[in-house]
């Protein structure tokens, strides 16, 4: 009798290949062997504005060079974080080692993928330090944007070989001839020198890799000198501790030797040295010009600072490589858990995030209104938003963030100086001078919007620094503006006034003296610290009116009348009243004597009066969230 196979056992031919067996065999190539001759190495990066197809082009390169099999390929292969993949942006710089042959000669290409957003300019500048060339990638349908220019200037400062490339030539809206002329005008080359590729279809990518080999110079360095390597990124791995990405400049680095960090003097034993192709692979070491990773078992990212120089502990180099600076926070905001019992979880979450993000700073603070929380420092608004989103998503936290503000330097009348990152630290009494940070902003937009952009920038206390036409249709405007005016909703206003066509970039430009005041919001005569803000004297009454009107709508009515006031020092500049709820005390009186009714009304009036003197206003959590989030609506860049 023929027995049927039980349903739970899948029937499979004996010769059918098992997916899980061959999936684990990594693709290997000649690029997996380290200590390649420097003449055969090319280190390059891709610089582009957000959404110009940088990660898609990197995906095509991984596929064409064969380091990722077609079946394992996924979109944005190098973007590891969920947020990066969802938003379509690159936050952490990644690197990958690619094999490539030109006319039978074998080359090793190191591609370093960089972020495009202004907040992560420091990540870009470090990645550029590890390269000799850069692909300047521009969307053939949109043209050059402000952040592309900013990153191009960073690359030119470092004398990198620039390869101009137009991407997305397969789009129906693409106009490669027009934008090739624009690119050529900026870089100073011929329009015919601009390569045309499509990251989506792969058209022109092989020719681009050939150009990288031809135009990017090989790395230079002394193989016999003491080892020197520059750290351009470090990430935290929960199993292995800190993984440090380096580019070797001189000498060689091999496993099991002791290394020293030149900025701190700390020494560690090297447990593993390897390359990324595109997954980490241990190797025998790294030679001149090579890019790879080091694992020392250290648990704190701050011990391997990006931009620092690694050397050997014995007979190490005497002089560090240049280019290291501490990333400085530009924007501060308070983060508070909605549920007060989540405070320890938030502390632990920030600790873990800081392992991966050296630019994030935080310190505990308390607010009368919001309870315990942290004052966090960020590189910019996108950095702040992404940090908050990661905290909420990866650690299941519900957070309230206070309106962002910048760092002010205040000189008091007695000559002492304090640094203010929080409105509640603003000194009471006489202030001699206040200094606020200023930034140089670059706005690129169609020339029809010049008038509306100038009007917006002037309303934000901007000073025009210059204006250039990139082409008859596109213009570049340069303004110097206070950072405090940009961090609220400047980006949103700019986008809405230019129908989304304008792009913005900014960089630090020191500080300037300013006439700033602290506006307090008073409920029932008591200041609520969460709503305080530092604003320019001319904009104080506008801020006061906006907040009092908003709170009048958000705070529920009480048994007594509640005044909502905005004050600068002891001077009230705006006021709204939340009307009292009145119980109908005359409902029991059917007709009857008027004096009886009057007596009841007088009694109610007395009660309300007494309530007003001793009553407290409880602001519900939802009102805080609504007031602060609508106030900081500019946090969210338009997608």
Curated annotation (Swiss-Prot):
Gene3D superfamilies, A to Z: 3.30.70.240, Elongation factor 4, C-terminal domain, Elongation Factor G (Translational Gtpase), domain 3, P-loop containing nucleotide triphosphate hydrolases, Translation factors
Q: Give the gene name.
A: lepA
Q: Does the keyword Membrane apply?
A: yes
What catalytic activity does the UniProt entry give for this protein? GTP + H2O = GDP + phosphate + H(+)
InterPro entries annotated for this entry?
Answer: EF-4 (IPR006297), EFG_III/V (IPR035647), EFG_V-like (IPR000640), EFTu-like_2 (IPR004161), G_TR_CS (IPR031157), LepA_C_sf (IPR038363), LepA_CTD (IPR013842), LepA_IV (IPR035654)
Which family does this protein fall into? Belongs to the TRAFAC class translation factor GTPase superfamily. Classic translation factor GTPase family. LepA subfamily.
**Would the keyword Cell cycle turn up in this protein's UniProt record?**
no
Q: Tell me where in this chain the tr-type G domain is found.
A: 39-220
Know the name of this protein? Answer: Elongation factor 4
GO terms of biological process kind: positive regulation of translation
Q: Which UniProt keywords apply?
A: Cell membrane, GTP-binding, Hydrolase, Membrane, Nucleotide-binding, Protein biosynthesis
Q: What is its EC number?
A: 3.6.5.n1
NCBIfam families in UniProt? lepA, small_GTP
- Report the principal subcellular site: membrane
Q: Which GO terms describe its cellular component?
A: plasma membrane
The UniProt entry, under SMART domains, shows: EFG_C
Q: Where in the cell is it found?
A: Cell membrane
Q: Which organism is it from?
A: Mycobacterium sp. (strain KMS)
Q: What does this protein do?
A: Required for accurate and efficient protein synthesis under certain stress conditions. May act as a fidelity factor of the translation reaction, by catalyzing a one-codon backward translocation of tRNAs on improperly translocated ribosomes. Back-translocation proceeds from a post-translocation (POST) complex to a pre-translocation (PRE) complex, thus giving elongation factor G a second chance to translocate the tRNAs correctly. Binds to ribosomes in a GTP-dependent manner.
| Disulfide-bond pairs as recorded | none
Under the heading SUPFAM superfamilies, the entry gives: EF-G C-terminal domain-like, P-loop containing nucleoside triphosphate hydrolases, Translation proteins
Q: How does it sit in the membrane?
A: Peripheral membrane protein
Among Pfam families, the record links this protein to: EFG_C (PF00679), GTP_EFTU (PF00009), GTP_EFTU_D2 (PF03144), LepA_C (PF06421)
Annotated residues that bind GTP are located at 51-56, 167-170
Q: Any idea which GO molecular function terms this record carries?
A: GTP binding; GTPase activity; ribosome binding; translation elongation factor activity
- Which top-level enzyme class is recorded in the Swiss-Prot or TrEMBL entry? hydrolase
């Amino acid at each position: 009798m023929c027995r049927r196979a039980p349903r739970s056992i899948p029937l499979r031919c004996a010769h059918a290949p098992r997916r899980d067996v061959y999936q684990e065999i990594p693709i290997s190539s000649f690029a997996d062997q380290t200590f390649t001759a420097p003449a055969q190495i090319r280190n390059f990066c891709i610089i582009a504005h957000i959404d110009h197809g940088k990660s898609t082009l990197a995906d095509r390169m991984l596929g064409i060079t064969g380091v990722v099999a077609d079946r394992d390929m996924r979109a944005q292969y190098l973007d590891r974080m969920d947020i990066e993949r969802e938003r379509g942006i690159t936050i952490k710089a990644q690197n990958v080692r690619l094999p490539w042959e030109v006319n039978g000669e074998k080359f090793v290409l190191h591609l370093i993928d960089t972020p495009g957003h202004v907040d992560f300019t420091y990540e870009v500048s470090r990645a550029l330090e590890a390269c000799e060339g850069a692909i300047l990638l521009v969307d053939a349908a949109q043209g050059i944007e402000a952040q592309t220019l900013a990153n191009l200037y960073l690359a030119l400062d470092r004398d990198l070989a620039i390869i101009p490339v137009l991407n997305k030539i397969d789009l129906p809206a693409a106009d490669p001839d027009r934008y090739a002329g624009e690119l050529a005008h900026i870089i100073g080359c011929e329009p015919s020198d601009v390569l045309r590729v499509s990251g989506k279809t792969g058209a022109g990518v092989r020719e681009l890799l050939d150009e990288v080999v031809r135009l990017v110079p090989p790395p230079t360095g002394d193989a016999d000198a003491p080892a020197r390597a520059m750290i351009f990124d470090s990430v935290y791995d929960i199993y292995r501790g800190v993984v440090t990405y380096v580019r070797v400049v001189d000498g060689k680095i091999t496993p099991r030797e002791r290394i020293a960090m030149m900025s701190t003097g700390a020494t560690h034993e090297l447990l593993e040295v390897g390359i990324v192709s595109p997954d980490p692979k241990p190797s025998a070491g790294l030679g001149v010009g090579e890019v790879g990773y080091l694992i020392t078992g250290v648990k704190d990212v701050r011990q391997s600072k990006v931009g620092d120089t690694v050397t050997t502990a014995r007979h190490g180099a005497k002089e560090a490589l240049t280019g290291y600076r501490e990333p400085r926070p530009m924007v501060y905001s308070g983060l508070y858990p909605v549920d007060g019992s989540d405070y320890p979880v938030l502390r632990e979450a920030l600790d873990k995030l800081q392992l991966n993000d050296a630019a994030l700073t935080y310190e505990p603070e308390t607010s009368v209104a919001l309870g315990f929380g942290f004052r966090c420092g960020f590189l910019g608004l996108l950095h702040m938003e992404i940090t908050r989103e990661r905290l909420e998503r990866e650690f299941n936290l519900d957070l309230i963030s206070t309106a962002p503000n910048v760092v002010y330097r205040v000189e008091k009348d007695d000559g002492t100086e304090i640094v203010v990152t929080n409105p509640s630290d603003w000194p009471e009494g006489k202030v001699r001078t206040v200094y606020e940070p200023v930034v140089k902003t670059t706005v690129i937009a169609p020339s029809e919007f010049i008038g509306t952009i100038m009007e917006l920038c002037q309303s934000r206390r901007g000073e025009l620094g210059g204006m250039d036409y990139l082409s008859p249709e596109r213009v570049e405007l340069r303004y110097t503006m206070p950072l405090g005016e940009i961090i609220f909703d400047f980006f949103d206003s700019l986008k809405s006034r230019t129908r989304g066509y304008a792009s913005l970039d900014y960089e630090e430009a020191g500080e300037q003296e300013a006439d700033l005041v602290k506006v307090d919001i008073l409920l029932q005569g008591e200041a609520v610290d969460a709503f305080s803000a530092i604003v320019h004297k001319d904009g104080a009454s506008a801020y006061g009116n906006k907040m009092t009107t908003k709170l009048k709508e958000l705070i529920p009515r009480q048994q007594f009348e509640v005044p909502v006031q905005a004050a600068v020092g002891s001077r009230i500049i705006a006021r709204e009243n939340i009307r009292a709820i009145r119980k109908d005390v005359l409902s029991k009186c059917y007709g009857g004597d008027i004096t009886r009714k009057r007596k009841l009304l007088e009694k109610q009036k007395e009660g309300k009066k007494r309530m007003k003197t001793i009553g407290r206003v409880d602001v519900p959590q939802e009102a805080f969230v609504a007031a602060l989030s609508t106030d900081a609506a500019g946090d969210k860049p338009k997608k």
